[in-house]
Design a protein with these regions (language model features):
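Short, well-structured active-site flanking segments
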Residues: 172
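Alpha-helical support elements that line or immediately flank enzyme active sites
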Residues: 158-169
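Hard-cation-handling environments
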Residues: 176
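Active-site cavity-forming subdomains of large catalytic enzyme subunits
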Residues: 1-142, 147
Length: 176
């Protein structure tokens, strides 16, 4: 809605979930590095009879033990990277964890980003700088380059084109 309404605002990302762990099979060797990608592998192993239903449930329960988005470069992490590279999120806002191994409700980096974002928003309001002043054609080109460099989700085509249209920035599929 920021591109559509041009209302003062910034994006704040909650962070990425801490990886989990389980104590059986090939996943035990990963230690505390179980991610959403491992769930897909576990699901296939279950469907082929190599993993029991109970083990699949254990992987499912532990793949994202805390808050935040999945720990892979899928849509949420790609779009947070776009928000940062387009200028609508503070630097380093797309790259912090959401929590500490699910033992804390919020990672200190998230709290710090929230406070810094509010402070920055007040400065933007005082200066009269709105989202469409930030979301320029050059900012979109920066976002496209960043996503390609990081190997982001192909969903970015849909989302970036929609945001560009709302921001009235002439970026079409041929430029992405």
């Amino acid at each position: 809605p920021l591109a559509r309404t041009n209302a003062f605002g910034l994006v704040l990302y909650p962070g990425t979930s801490t990886p989990g762990s389980v104590s059986f099979g090939a996943w035990a060797a990963k230690g505390n590095n179980l991610t959403i990608l491992d769930y897909a592998e576990a699901r296939a192993a279950n469907e082929s009879g190599r993993l029991s239903g109970e083990e699949l449930l254990e992987v499912e329960r532990n793949v994202m033990p805390g808050s935040g988005t999945c720990g892979a470069m899928f849509t949420a992490n790609t779009m947070s990277t776009i928000a940062e590279s387009i200028g609508m999120m503070l630097p380093r806002g797309a790259s912090h964890p959401a929590d500490y191994e699910a033992s804390s409700p919020m990672h200190a980096d998230v709290r710090s980003q929230a406070k810094a974002s509010v402070d920055a928003l007040y400065r933007l309001i005082a200066a009269g700088i709105r989202p469409l002043d930030i979301m320029t054609e050059r900012a979109f080109e920066n976002a496209i380059t960043t996503v390609y460099a990081m190997g982001g989700s192909t969903n970015m085509y849909l989302h970036l084109l929609a945001i560009a249209r709302e921001a009235q920035v002439p970026i079409g599929i041929e430029r992405i």
